[in-house]
């Protein structure tokens, strides 16, 4: 029995320790297992001009993307800015490069009840989208540093807000068209290129997302430990290689291995992700494209994609369409945008379990309309699924409790004779048909489910700002009054009392104080996760009490 209890608490302790370690890392603190979080490079207060070419040619016969100035002597700050808005998104587009330098998400609010500002261009934080042209013949073409003019704006025939910006250099005119769809975080972006010179130009369109490596602002509605991100940085998706996370630290060390060449017709996109939110370019897939990433001066990082436009002859016009996503990682929405786009939502290493758990939780919420009650119903369903295993476990524990006096007597009888004691215990287990390890299997099986649910609640923007009842106004952050952790501590204490008392005094004390230790740790977990654990404990107590009553009437032989 001692061995069984040791395995039980070792498994439970390890799962709790892993979750606490995740919280430490998320908060930017050193991991319990060594290794401090990488510090973010400082972002210069004032950007400088850099004309260095730092992205090599990767598409055969295509020009490289020049790392033209990230800004042009403060041009973005001083340039005229234009606003484009629908019912969920407000974009700010700078005349310098026609870059999208600000994006406010009207349906996602901060602690100050203001819209989350995902894209920003400030002295302390830079995160924006840009695009432009390069050519083998002439790099001085309309790019992300050129001055663009607003040539048309308003609403199209479908009532969609739009704006058209244009710039011309060396006989090449680039028009960028931005169209917002109602209720959508996806921006339709068109690049129309017209060649007026007598010499044909092999042109390449590049689309990039640029940001610094600083952690995103604490944008949970009520702050808290779990406002921190799961992963912040560039990601790339191709149909062949699937989803690739690119750490800022790996980019610094040139240790990035991503599929650079994307075949024609193969779905691919590039993005920047952070906790709850993401931005992405989804170019067309008619031709082969090239993915690249790197660090730019001033502590800025970029990920981009080159799309060859071919040889553009005199008087010719080429139009290349793309989509720019700027918004929350709502799984139902992400699935409709592009192949593999739902992978932007990070479930960690247990995605295979977390995705169906979220699917079930989301469908329950569809009918219930409250995420707190949805978590409770999900807990009941999970408990029903594991009921046969749990019943077997509790029966085994109840039988162990029955023979507890006999085990104590055996320890006295065979004191100093461990071999005879083990033989006597095994013989008793055989006669009573007791498996001393029978209570461990359900615990071991449920640990991955518990960790998967942890990632579901941590990663799901759907629960961000979602209330339950009374004092719980946001299930994604810790309980502000610690009521749920206290209830959980009491429930764990009751559970230990329903279990057989370990004969070892030290082990008995460990089991007595374990609920307190874990409850303190759960003070920092999202209220939704603690709610799941509380309900699970209460159901377990009811089930175990019933089984104890059933077997308590049967005396041990």
Curated annotation (Swiss-Prot):
HAMAP family listed in its UniProt record: YidC_type1
Q: What molecular function terms (GO) are annotated for this protein? A: membrane insertase activity
Q: Which PANTHER family match?
A: CYTOCHROME C OXIDASE ASSEMBLY PROTEIN COX18, MITOCHONDRIAL, OXA1
Write down a Pfam family by its short name.
YidC_periplas
Spell out the Gene3D superfamilies in the cross-references.
Answer: 2.70.98.90
For whether the record's keyword set contains Protein transport, the answer is: yes
Encoded by which gene?
yidC
State where the protein is found. Answer: Cell inner membrane
- Protein name as it appears in the record: Membrane protein insertase YidC
| Source organism superkingdom | Bacteria
Transmembrane stretches, by residue range?
371-391, 437-457, 515-535
Q: What is the lineage of its organism?
A: Bacteria, Pseudomonadati, Pseudomonadota, Betaproteobacteria, Burkholderiales
The entry describes its oligomerization and partners as: Interacts with the Sec translocase complex via SecD. Specifically interacts with transmembrane segments of nascent integral membrane proteins during membrane integration.
InterPro entries in UniProt: Membr_insert_YidC, Membr_insert_YidC_N, YidC/ALB3/OXA1/COX18, YidC/Oxa/ALB_C, YidC_ALB_C, YidC_periplasmic_sf
Family per record: Belongs to the OXA1/ALB3/YidC family. Type 1 subfamily.
The entry's function note states: Required for the insertion and/or proper folding and/or complex formation of integral membrane proteins into the membrane. Involved in integration of membrane proteins that insert both dependently and independently of the Sec translocase complex, as well as at least some lipoproteins. Aids folding of multispanning membrane proteins.
């Amino acid at each position: 029995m001692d061995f069984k209890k040791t395995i039980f608490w070792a498994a439970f302790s390890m799962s709790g320790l892993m979750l606490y370690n995740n919280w430490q890392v998320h908060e930017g603190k050193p991991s319990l297992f060594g290794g401090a979080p990488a510090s973010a490079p400082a972002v210069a207060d004032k950007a400088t001009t850099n004309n260095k070419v730092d992205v090599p040619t990767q598409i055969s016969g295509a020009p490289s993307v020049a790392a033209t100035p990230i800004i042009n002597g403060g041009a973005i700050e001083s340039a005229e800015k234009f606003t484009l808005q629908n019912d969920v998104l407000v974009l700010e587009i700078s005349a310098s490069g026609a870059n999208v330098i600000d994006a406010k998400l009207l349906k996602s609010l901060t602690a100050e009840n203001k819209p989350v500002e995902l894209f920003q261009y400030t002295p302390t934080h830079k995160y924006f989208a840009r695009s432009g042209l390069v050519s083998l013949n002439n790099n001085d073409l309309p790019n992300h540093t050129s001055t663009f003019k607003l040539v048309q704006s308003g609403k199209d025939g479908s009532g969609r807000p739009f704006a058209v910006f244009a710039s011309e250099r060396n006989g090449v005119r680039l028009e960028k068209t931005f169209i917002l769809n109602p209720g959508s975080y996806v921006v339709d972006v068109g690049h129309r290129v017209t060649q007026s010179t007598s010499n044909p130009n092999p042109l390449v369109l590049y689309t990039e997302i640029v940001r610094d490596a600083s952690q995103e602002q604490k944008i949970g509605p009520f702050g808290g430990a779990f406002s921190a991100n799961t992963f912040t940085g560039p990601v790339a998706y191709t149909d062949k290689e699937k989803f690739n996370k690119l750490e800022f630290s790996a980019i610094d060390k040139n240790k990035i291995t991503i599929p650079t060449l994307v075949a024609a017709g193969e779905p691919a996109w590039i993005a920047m992700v952070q906790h709850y939110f993401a931005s992405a370019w989804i170019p067309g897939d008619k031709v082969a494209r090239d993915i690249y990433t790197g660090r730019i001066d001033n502590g800025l990082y970029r990920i981009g994609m080159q799309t060859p436009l071919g040889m553009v002859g005199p008087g010719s016009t080429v139009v290349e369409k793309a989509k720019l996503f700027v918004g929350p990682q709502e799984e139902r929405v992400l699935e409709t945008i592009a192949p593999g786009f739902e992978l932007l939502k990070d479930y960690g290493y247990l995605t295979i379990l977390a995705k169906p758990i979220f699917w079930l939780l989301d469908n329950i919420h569809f009918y219930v309309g409250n995420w707190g009650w949805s978590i409770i119903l999900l807990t009941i369903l999970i408990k029903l699924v594991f009921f046969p295993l749990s019943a077997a476990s509790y029966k085994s524990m109840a039988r162990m409790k029955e023979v507890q006096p006999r085990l104590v007597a055996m320890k006295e009888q065979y004191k100093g004779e461990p071999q005879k004691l083990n033989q006597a215990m095994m013989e008793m287990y055989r006669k009573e048909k007791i498996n001393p390890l029978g209570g461990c299997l359900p615990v071991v099986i449920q640990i991955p489910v518990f960790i998967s649910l942890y990632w579901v609640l941590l990663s799901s923007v759907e629960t961000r700002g979602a209330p339950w009842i009374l004092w719980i106004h946001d299930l994604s952050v810790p309980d502000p009054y610690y009521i749920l952790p206290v209830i959980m501590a009491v429930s764990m204490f009751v559970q230990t009392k329903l279990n057989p008392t370990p004969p070892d005094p030290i082990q008995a004390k460990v089991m007595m104080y374990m609920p307190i230790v874990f409850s303190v740790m759960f003070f920092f977990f999202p209220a939704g996760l603690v709610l799941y654990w509380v309900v699970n404990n209460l159901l377990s107590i009811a089930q175990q009490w019933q089984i104890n009553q059933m077997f308590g009437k049967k005396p041990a032989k």
